[in-house]
A protein has these predicted regions:
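Non-catalytic, well-ordered alpha-helical segments in soluble enzyme domains
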Residues: 86, 233-247
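Short, surface-exposed acidic
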Residues: 243-255, 326
Length: 368
């Protein structure tokens, strides 16, 4: 790899130059979006994306956590990290007590922005636990070809939109900016796939198709089902990771300890105690990643017309995804009071019914 006099690889300069030449969208200011390989991406993560595509060497033992932004990433990171490291750390002095889940599981899209940071991953012991917000189409070829395991979490699009809008407000505040993004404008951009990481529908479809084409490689989780049954989710997660809970662990309540450690309330309280700035770029504070940790908040933001439009887009985007198997559904079965419905023949990404959700909240089932 040829170096310049400043020590920066020549292709690094090329990546920076390439980013500045890509189509620009500033409707989410101060977040600048660039269109790269057909996908709108945050400008901040583009050099890292390019570096990862060129230099990252995946291993068959790697575990990759993938998600569309604001779909349950923080919770998934905490659960996976705690499950994989449960024999190394006691719950009383666990790393999650003083580290944010995003500090425990690095985001490939960001750390690859520095080749020095990317090279440090090469020295990490197996199995490496890494996360990404990249759609499947933008993943490094080494990830696609090495056979490493992928864990994907998706969320009802309307709730994802609302969560992203609130998170954007935190970005504006933490950067000391005054721009306010009207919800209606973000709604239009969301419908047009002009969002960081592109289309939520194409994002989910990419990993869903990988799941159906390579059985056993992808664990496809749904945020709302995680909320409804965290213990069941944790059991599936541990089995997929190859470290199922032993009879002794079940007897002494290890799974319950992990669920409690990674609960929304506990992680939020820990984040408020930590009270410091972390990634991306030191912009966000530890508590910025926690708001409600619930399903159904879209009802407080979307008009019936907005909700109907998103549901129509979802139905159109996911039409024909069954292909002889189970169909991916991202549309809520609970739109404006319709009866909750779920069958064993479909994989529904459902929002919990209001009446069921109230019970879940009282039992502390709402998670980050």
């Amino acid at each position: 790899m040829e170096n310049t006099e400043e020590g920066l690889p020549t292709d690094q300069h090329f990546h920076h130059d390439l980013v500045s030449s890509l189509p620009l969208e500033e409707g989410m200011s101060p977040v600048r979006l660039r269109k790269y390989q057909g996908v709108w991406m945050s400008e901040y993560f583009l050099v890292g994306t390019m570096n990862a595509q060129r230099y990252f060497k995946a291993r068959p033992t790697d575990i990759l956590l993938a998600s569309y932004p604001k779909s349950g990433t923080t919770w998934l990171k905490a659960l996976t990290f705690a499950t994989m490291t449960r024999t190394r750390h006691s719950f009383g002095c666990h790393p999650l007590h003083h580290l944010n889940p995003h500090e425990c599981v690095p985001l490939l899209d960001e750390i690859a922005g520095s080749l020095e940071s990317l090279s440090e991953i090469d020295f990490a012991s197996d199995p490496r636990l890494i996360s990404t917000h990249l759609p499947l189409s933008l993943l490094p070829e080494s990830i696609k070809s090495c056979g490493c395991r992928l864990i994907y979490v998706c969320r009802e699009p309307k709730d994802t939109l609302v969560s992203r809008w609130h998170f954007h407000g935190k970005i504006v505040t933490n950067m000391g900016k005054s721009e306010e993004l009207p919800f209606e404008k973000m709604f239009d951009m969301f419908c047009d796939d002009i969002m960081p990481s592109g289309s939520i529908w194409e994002h989910a479809l990419g990993y869903w198709n990988e799941k159906t084409q390579t059985p056993g490689r992808v664990l496809f989780l749904k945020y709302e089902e995680m909320l409804e049954d965290p213990m069941g989710t944790l059991t599936r997660l541990a089995e997929f990771l190859g470290c199922p809970f032993t009879e002794e662990e079940l007897r002494v309540g290890v799974p319950a300890e992990i669920v409690n450690l990674c609960s929304f309330g506990n992680l939020r309280d820990l984040a408020m105690q930590q009270n410091r700035r972390i990634s991306p770029g030191g912009i966000m504070t530890t508590e910025s990643y926690y708001r409600k940790g619930a399903a159904g908040d879209w009802r407080n933001h979307l008009s019936p017309e907005m909700a109907d439009k998103l549901d129509q887009i979802t139905a159109k985007k996911l039409q024909g995804t069954a292909k002889g198997g189970r169909q991916l559904q991202l549309r809520s079965c609970m739109d404006f009071g319709l009866p909750y419905a779920k069958t064993k023949d479909t994989d529904d990404l459902t929002q919990l019914a209001t009446e069921r959700g109230e019970a879940g909240r009282t039992q502390g089932q709402r998670k980050a």
